[in-house]
């Protein structure tokens, strides 16, 4: 047995499923998950000594690549002053100043410890600010594991949500309306059925949890207009897209102003950080200045703030996003060409430093139904064959891939060459 297999066997006796987040178990592709010993730049190194070109990037945070010296040094320096104080620090102020400068729609920001905390807190704030209970989310969009968000669509866009995880009371789920991503008609229908009851829409501006599905041109502006028409708040969940699709996020890339924004992943530089913020009048409703309660023992942790501050300063440097886009575009084009040469039907979506691979005969993939029609079994084979070639993709047909500026054009070309060999055998 390999070291990964031995560790996985031991882990399953001690940790549910052997992992601390389900997708890591390779449930979506089968086989034994890799146990990682170290990472540097664009590469992961497993406990058995094999190196992989990494397109998971810790599920998004590693936009600069692994073990970036500026972040590593910031963490070491901060740790020498203490690990946690439970009191305000100067770095929290500097971090808030930087975030609000980089994302102009955020007048104020509250730091938390994860993307889930950010989205659940933003929704609570929207409900408290509007005095309404219902929310709209989209089928196939994931916003963390808060109870009100673990809801799938029923039969039709207006069906009251049913929980898709045991442990979520139906009384919670009934306030979550699930609409179809990229379908404004379904959203208008929900508002017309509940015109005075919907507090907010929460949306991934690029749906990254049904792989990578960009918005149609009219979709995000249409959501903004519907929120304005019916008095609801628009929450853009930029946990995945923030500082990756563009410096000011997908909201800047697509030209849409939300009322609230949720951030995570890149904002922590690899440390556990989330944030939410937006309009000053809305944020003023948050405790201690307002009645909507939110708190956290480790929120604004000095080590995490130092890592995030260092990361964002690097991400804000000229040329970073141009490089991400160039590398991702080359990868997407190369994969399409290699698949076409082999007669493999393939769609590759990409925006900024995100991409998605879909085995499908369709010309495009724009919604959850399109994603579910893709050939998942072929993706599983593709994943394992690419892994054997030394390329680490997300171990699920429903997760986006992530580029970093640490990837070289040689890495991209080697990945395309590996895919060409795999497609020939697929």
UniProtKB/Swiss-Prot annotation:
One of its GO biological process terms is: protoporphyrinogen IX biosynthetic process
Write out the GO cellular component annotations. cytoplasm
Where does this polypeptide localize? Cytoplasm
* EC numbers for this chain: 5.4.3.8
Q: What GO molecular function terms would the record report?
A: glutamate-1-semialdehyde 2,1-aminomutase activity; pyridoxal phosphate binding; transaminase activity
- Give the pathway: Porphyrin-containing compound metabolism; protoporphyrin-IX biosynthesis; 5-aminolevulinate from L-glutamyl-tRNA(Glu): step 2/2
Cofactor field: pyridoxal 5'-phosphate
The chain's coiled-coil residues are: none
Q: Sorted alphabetically, which keywords does the UniProt record give?
A: Cytoplasm, Isomerase, Porphyrin biosynthesis, Pyridoxal phosphate
What is the protein's major site of localization?
A: cytoplasm
Q: Which reaction does it catalyse?
A: (S)-4-amino-5-oxopentanoate = 5-aminolevulinate
Q: Where are the transmembrane segments?
A: none
What assembly does the database describe for this protein? Homodimer.
**NCBIfam families registered for this protein in UniProt:** hemL (TIGR00713), PRK00062.1 (NF000818)
Q: Which family does it belong to?
A: Belongs to the class-III pyridoxal-phosphate-dependent aminotransferase family. HemL subfamily.
List the protein's name. Glutamate-1-semialdehyde 2,1-aminomutase
Question: What organism does the record attribute this protein to?
Answer: Escherichia coli O1:K1 / APEC
Gene name as annotated:
hemL
């Amino acid at each position: 047995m390999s070291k990964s297999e031995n560790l996985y066997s031991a882990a399953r006796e001690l940790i549910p499923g052997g992992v601390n987040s389900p997708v890591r178990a390779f449930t979506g592709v089968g086989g034994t998950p890799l146990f990682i010993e170290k990472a540097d730049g664009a590469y992961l190194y497993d406990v058995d000594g094999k190196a992989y070109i990494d397109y998971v990037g810790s599920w998004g945070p590693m936009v600069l690549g692994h073990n970036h010296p500026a972040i590593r040094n910031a963490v070491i320096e901060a740790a020498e002053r203490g690990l946690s104080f439970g009191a305000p620090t100067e770095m929290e102020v500097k971090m808030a100043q930087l975030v609000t400068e980089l994302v102009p729609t955020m007048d104020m920001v509250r730091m938390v410890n994860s993307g889930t905390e950010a989205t659940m807190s933003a929704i609570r704030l929207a409900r408290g600010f509007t005095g309404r209970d219902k929310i709209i989310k989209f089928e196939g969009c994931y916003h963390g594991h808060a109870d009100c968000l673990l809801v799938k669509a029923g039969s039709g866009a207006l069906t009251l949500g049913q929980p898709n995880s045991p442990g979520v009371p139906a009384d919670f789920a009934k306030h979550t309306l699930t609409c179809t991503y990229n379908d404004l008609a379904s959203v208008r229908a929900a508002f017309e059925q509940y015109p005075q009851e919907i507090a907010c829409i929460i949306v991934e501006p690029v749906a990254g949890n049904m792989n990578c599905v960009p918005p149609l041109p009219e979709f995000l502006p249409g959501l903004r207009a519907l929120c304005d028409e019916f008095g609801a708040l628009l929450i853009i969940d930029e946990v995945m897209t923030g500082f990756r699709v563009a410096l000011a996020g997908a909201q800047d890339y697509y030209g849409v102003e939300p009322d609230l924004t949720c951030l995570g992943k890149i904002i922590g530089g690899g440390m556990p950080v989330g944030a939410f913020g937006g309009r000053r009048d809305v944020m003023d409703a948050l405790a201690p200045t307002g009645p909507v309660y939110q708190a956290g023992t480790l929120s604004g942790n000095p080590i995490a703030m130092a890592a995030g501050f260092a990361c964002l300063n690097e991400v804000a440097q000229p040329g970073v996003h141009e490089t991400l886009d160039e590398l991702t575009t080359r990868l997407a084009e190369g994969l399409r060409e290699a698949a076409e040469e082999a007669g493999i039907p393939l769609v590759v979506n990409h925006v900024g430093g995100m991409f998605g691979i879909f085995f499908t005969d369709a010309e495009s993939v724009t919604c959850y139904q399109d994603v579910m029609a893709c050939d998942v079994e072929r993706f599983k084979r593709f994943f394992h064959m690419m892994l054997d070639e030394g390329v680490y993709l997300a171990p699920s047909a429903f997760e986006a891939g992530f580029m970093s500026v640490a990837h070289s054009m040689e890495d991209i070309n080697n990945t395309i060459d590996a895919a060409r060999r795999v497609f020939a055998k697929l």
